[in-house]
Amino acid sequence: MYQLSNEDWLMNIENTAAEAEKKYGAEAVEFVFKKYGATCSEGLNPSDYSEVFGELYQMSVD
């Protein structure tokens, strides 16, 4: 199984956050980051990357 690097995770999170922001606004994306104790993608704990990506991805494809 291939593991994404932290840089790959951050790039995916940032791209997905941009898509989610187009649909729901910056406040919705900020809410997701705040749930994980961050104000932006760079402030996230790497252990939360997959969870944050999953939430943002769901928003972006709704």
Where are these regions (language model features)?
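Interfaces that engage single-stranded nucleic acids at replication/repair/recombination sites
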Residues: 1-62
